[in-house]
From Swiss-Prot:
Name used for this protein in its record: Superkiller complex protein 8
Family indicated by similarity: Belongs to the SKI8 family.
PTM sites of type N-acetylthreonine: T2
Entries under PANTHER family matching the protein: SUPERKILLER COMPLEX PROTEIN 8 (PTHR44090:SF1), WD REPEAT-CONTAINING PROTEIN 61 (PTHR44090)
Family annotation (Pfam families): WD40 (PF00400)
Organism: Mus musculus (Mouse)
PROSITE patterns for this protein: WD_REPEATS_1 (PS00678), WD_REPEATS_2 (PS50082), WD_REPEATS_REGION (PS50294)
Gene Ontology cellular component terms for the protein in this record: Cdc73/Paf1 complex; cytoplasm; cytosol; euchromatin; nucleus; Ski complex
Residues the record lists as N-acetylmethionine modifications: M1
Protein task: Component of the PAF1 complex (PAF1C) which has multiple functions during transcription by RNA polymerase II and is implicated in regulation of development and maintenance of embryonic stem cell pluripotency. PAF1C associates with RNA polymerase II through interaction with POLR2A CTD non-phosphorylated and 'Ser-2'- and 'Ser-5'-phosphorylated forms and is involved in transcriptional elongation, acting both independently and synergistically with TCEA1 and in cooperation with the DSIF complex and HTATSF1. PAF1C is required for transcription of Hox and Wnt target genes.
InterPro entries: G-protein_beta_WD-40_rep, SKI8, WD40/YVTN_repeat-like_dom_sf, WD40_repeat_CS, WD40_repeat_dom_sf, WD40_rpt
Keywords assigned by UniProt, alphabetized: Acetylation, Cytoplasm, Nucleus, Repeat, Transcription, Transcription regulation, WD repeat, Wnt signaling pathway
Subcellular location: Nucleus; Cytoplasm
Coiled coil: none
């Protein structure tokens, strides 16, 4: 048990180019901590976190261009990646083999996310649609249309009820998954929404934008519950802590910040990266944060819990 924030581990030269995406999944049953990274070097790498360090398990080849997004299933040993090559690939984390390659269409595979039950994969498109693919079928099952601009970011609510998307023009849309209806359109930012994340109880939505602000919304009523400033440049990624009371953000200002949801304040800032920090995630119990960036490094931080 630590009672302070500190950097625990640095993996230098983790990739041969900028690292744009990271995911961390904790398998509580088998006590396995898996980190997946995606880089502009076209590779997806699978790491195991054990004994306070990252060990490279698989280096997954297949994408022809840079990897822009990765996610790990919450229920199956599967990772997904999307790339500038317009393909989504599904990977078996037990043997490091590619399971499926899905042709999503040009610029139609940006951020991707597994549904909470891992039956579907959602990805934003440049035409303002969210395409939903079946994990089993590898085919497009349906689309949700924002009638808006290029969707840079998407997130499922943990309770499986909502899907939120963030567009290049700063518009946020929240869909009801059961009906496919657009519930709310939020005009919260004037610049691209790089990332959004739901709280573990699915009540709040946190958004990150190039305008340098982080916003917190009450999902049910679509009310703005807070505007947070502190980053000196674009906010590139946000991720909620499993404890429901903190979230983490990363920015072009090279920093990683931890925020208290209740007080809407920044409680710690890490300045360990040498360049833009594209991705941040918590582990399963909120005791660790992982970050990745243009400096080709993976950092793991200790958090008090």
């Amino acid at each position: 048990m630590t009672n302070q924030y500190s950097i625990l581990f640095k993996q230098e030269q983790a990739h041969d180019d900028a690292i744009w995406s990271v995911a961390w999944e904790t398998n509580k049953k088998e006590n396995i901590e898996t980190v997946v990274t995606g880089s502009l070097d076209d590779l997806v790498k699978v790491w195991k976190w054990r004994d306070e360090r990252l060990e490279l398990q698989w280096s997954l080849e297949g994408h022809q261009l840079g990897v822009v997004s990765v996610d790990i299933s919450h229920t199956l040993p599967i990772a997904a990646s999307s790339s500038l090559d317009a393909h989504i690939r599904l990977w078996d984390l037990e043997n490091g083999k590619q399971m499926k390659s899905i042709d999503a269409g040009p610029v139609d595979a940006w951020t991707l996310a597994f549904s909470p039950d891992s039956q579907y994969l959602a990805t934003g498109t440049h035409m303002g649609k969210v395409n939903i693919f079946g994990v089993e079928s590898g085919k497009k099952e349906y689309s949700l249309d924002t009638r808006g601009k290029f969707i840079l970011s998407i997130a499922y609510s943990p309770d499986g009820k909502y899907l939120a998307s963030g567009a290049i023009d700063g518009i946020i849309n929240i869909f009801d998954i059961a009906t496919g209806k657009l519930l709310h359109t939020l005009e919260g930012h004037a610049m691209p929404i790089r990332s959004l994340t739901f709280s573990p109880d699915s009540q709040l939505l946190v958004t990150a934008s190039d305008d340098g602000y982080i916003k917190i919304y009450d999902v049910q009523h679509a009310n703005l519950a807070g505007t947070l400033s502190g980053h000196a440049s674009w906010v590139l990624n946000v991720a909620f802590c499993p404890d429901d009371t903190h979230f983490v953000s990363s920015s072009s200002d090279k920093s990683v910040k931890v925020w208290d949801v209740g007080t809407r304040t920044c409680i710690h800032t890490f300045f360990d990266h040498q360049d833009q920090v594209w991705g941040v995630k918590y582990n399963g119990n909120g005791s660790k944060i992982v970050s990745v960036g243009d400096d080709q490094e993976i950092h793991v931080y200790d958090c008090p819990i």
